[in-house]
A protein has these predicted regions:
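Small-aliphatic-rich amphipathic alpha-helix that forms the alpha element of a beta-alpha
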Residues: 51-76, 93-101, 182-186, 190, ...
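N-terminal glycine-rich phosphate/pyrophosphate-binding loops that anchor nucleotide-derived ligands
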Residues: 1-60, 64-67, 129, 143-144, ...
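Active-site-proximal betaalpha loop/short-helix elements
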Residues: 83-85, 173-232, 274
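Acidic, Ser/Thr/Pro-rich beta/coil linker or hinge segments at domain junctions
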Residues: 174-178, 247-275
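Short hydrophobic/aromatic beta-strand micro-patches
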Residues: 125-127, 236-240
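Short, compositionally biased
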Residues: 156-173
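Glycine-rich anion-binding loops of enzyme active sites
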Residues: 38, 72-159, 256
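General beta-strand structural signal in soluble alpha/beta enzymes
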Residues: 18, 32-35, 106-110, 124, ...
Length: 275
């Protein structure tokens, strides 16, 4: 079953109006909330990463969603299930990584239990005061699509790990992704119009497709290097063209939003009807 199908079943059963974006926006409380699991042999292998790197990435996958919403990272709770071979030094380094990967957010609690595999479940809270919060359903015809950073390094790093390599710039990009709080702040603190923003944890092309589908538009994009990669954790946003001169941060334009035309995503005139 695809992730979207599963999400739709959960939405139907819970009748929740908060499910759909990577963060739930609780407007009356001025916060966003998100949660991600980080599971050994699913999302990482202990032989490929240091305890610090495991903790760092476990935090950044959550903080990235907070930044994609436009909010400011504020708090984390950490649920940890650890096997018996995890020692005190491992835990110290793991939590040092979580703290560094929190980008200023404070760890305020959590839960600890035993288990057969290392399992980290983090809930992140961001504050929304003086910020305009994004939604993937807010891309509109006439908007331009912007992003920042180089794509494809994380996917390259994973392949190198599979080949037995342990150190390279690409491997570090995969294990210790650098987030973009400045990009998020440059948009959310200055924009007044609705806009759509996501991180590219599942790939740039995937994020573009999800924004277009949620907004019922077509995004026409350039086929830049790494567009079909994954886990780069850059941000991509669809914003009004008139807003570009207000952004005091490096970015580049990769596409434009059009009225829906048969497919949600068009990359160099190749239409993608599903992704």
């Amino acid at each position: 079953m695809k992730e979207l199908e599963l999400i739709n079943i959960i939405k139907e059963q819970t009748q929740s109006g908060y499910i759909g974006d990577d963060c739930a926006f609780l407007k009356d409380l001025n916060i966003v909330v998100t949660q991600d699991n980080f599971i050994e042999d699913v999302h990482f292998k202990r032989e490929w990463a240091t305890p610090y790197q495991i903790g760092y990435k476990a935090a950044t996958v959550n903080i990235s969603d907070v930044l994609a919403s436009g909010a400011k990272p504020a708090y984390l709770t950490v649920g940890l299930s650890a096997p018996n071979d995890i020692d005190n030094d491992f835990i110290k380094e793991l939590y040092r990584g979580i703290s560094d990967g929190a980008y200023g957010a404070k760890i305020i609690g959590g839960d600890i239990t035993g288990g057969n595999k290392l399992f980290i479940s983090i809930t992140a809270i961001g504050t929304t005061k003086d910020r305009k919060i994004s939604s993937r359903s807010h891309a509109k015809p006439g908007y331009v699509v912007i992003t920042h950073g180089k794509y494809g390094e994380s996917a390259k790093g994973l392949e190198e790990l599979k080949q037995g390599l342990r150190k390279s710039d690409s491997i570090r990009a995969h294990l210790e992704p650098k987030l973009e709080p400045e990009f998020s702040e440059a948009i959310s603190c200055n924009i007044r119009e609705d806009y759509a923003m996501m991180d590219t944890s599942d790939g740039l092309a995937d994020a573009l497709y999800k924004i277009a589908e949620a907004s019922n538009v077509t995004i026409k994009a350039k086929n830049i290097e790494g567009i079909f990669g994954f886990e780069d954790y850059h941000l991509v946003a669809a914003v009004p063209d008139s807003f570009l001169n207000k952004i005091k941060f490096n970015y580049y334009v990769i596409g434009e939003v059009k009225e829906f035309d048969c497919s949600y995503l068009n990359i160099n005139n190749i239409k993608y009807y599903d992704y």
